[in-house]
Amino acid sequence: MAFQQSSPLVKFEASPAESFLSAPGDNFTSLFADSTPSTLNPRDMMTPDSVADIDSRLSVIPESQDAEDDESHSTSATAPSTSEKKPVKKRKSWGQVLPEPKTNLPPRKRAKTEDEKEQRRVERVLRNRRAAQSSRERKRLEVEALEKRNKELETLLINVQKTNLILVEELNRFRRSSGVVTRSSSPLDSLQDSITLSQQLFGSRDGQTMSNPEQSLMDQIMRSAANPTVNPASLSPSLPPISDKEFQTKEEDEEQADEDEEMEQTWHETKEAAAAKEKNSKQSRVSTDSTQRPAVSIGGDAAVPVFSDDAGANCLGLDPVHQDDGPFSIGHSFGLSAALDADRYLLESQLLASPNASTVDDDYLAGDSAACFTNPLPSDYDFDINDFLTDDANHAAYDIVAASNYAAADRELDLEIHDPENQIPSRHSIQQPQSGASSHGCDDGGIAVGV
């Protein structure tokens, strides 16, 4: 006790539970005021209720039940105490008023005496009450959040149900307006995927009418009120599968038909081209050329007159030539047909009686045709073609030359340029060499062929 009196005075807090410094034996003010009632309602110590809080959520333990529990605990505790005389810890009821501690023991100091232990017990009860209150508050907030979420989900579910009902009503109205027979609505209609087919989808395919079993099945489905769902595959006409061999045969037939059509078209084009070519060759055989104007010089100063128009041809007894027969006319430059026609001209006009064309100094004229060449008009020309026609030799030569012209026209020989120095001798001895050429070679005089 002397130690307690000699200890220095220290200023303490009002409550020993919240104080860090305390001296044993010091007297402190009571934790609970004198005005504190002997009985305390536990709800008075709790935090204020929230706005959303409902009284029915929290159940209050009746005091009568607490009293009965206390009595039961006391009876159970007194029975062994009387027999064994051993103190048993008595558990205080919830919400019981705590006694005032007699000591002010520091928090970190171990309690040794009964008063100090009582102080620790009171501090522990207060600490537990605060923890329980915070736990209840946290739980209340969580419950409120869950209730709010539940209300939102309920509202969303109600809206979805309303929308579903509206859609079902619209679907039924559309079915009634379209004439599709449907069964009576039930609460389970929204959970079923109903597929209805209109009557227009079941028309005949490719002009073929459905058989009687299929028609009866169709009528039964359309008139049935119990099963609106129809499998389209069961209503379509059955088609046998096509084998690969038949498919390949069909493709081959199509390809063969295309090839035949192309070959027929090519044959027609070739036939038309051959007919046109034959027609042109026939026209070339009938006509002769007199529109060209050749100028031929045969050795030295002897020259063959130039025909300016058809008058010269008429003077010689030749027929006029069409424009299409130009390649086979006399005056075509550097052509085989032109050379053959020049020889025919020499024979028909009887300018040279000798087959040797290089002997130009001698006059082998069978008749006097100077008047025709000086004035090659048809009025001054007195050559008689009948004299030539009666000549057998000249007539045979004319046939040979004409045959060669026809052969050249049929074979459609290409026009070639003949060198006057290198001439190929004629196959027929009676045929004259080409104009401007010699059977033995070049002459001393200038030999030229021009237009």
Curated annotation (Swiss-Prot):
Region (Disordered): 1-137, 228-296
GO biological process: positive regulation of transcription by RNA polymerase II; response to unfolded protein
Record carries keyword Nucleus: yes
Any matching Pfam family: bZIP_2
Domain bZIP: 118-181
Residue ranges of the region described as Leucine-zipper: 146-153
GO cellular component, one term: nucleus
Family the UniProt entry places it in: Belongs to the bZIP family.
Protein name: Transcriptional activator hac1
Source organism of the structure: Hypocrea jecorina (Trichoderma reesei)
Lineage, top ranks: Eukaryota, Fungi, Dikarya, Ascomycota, Pezizomycotina
Gene (UniProt): hac1
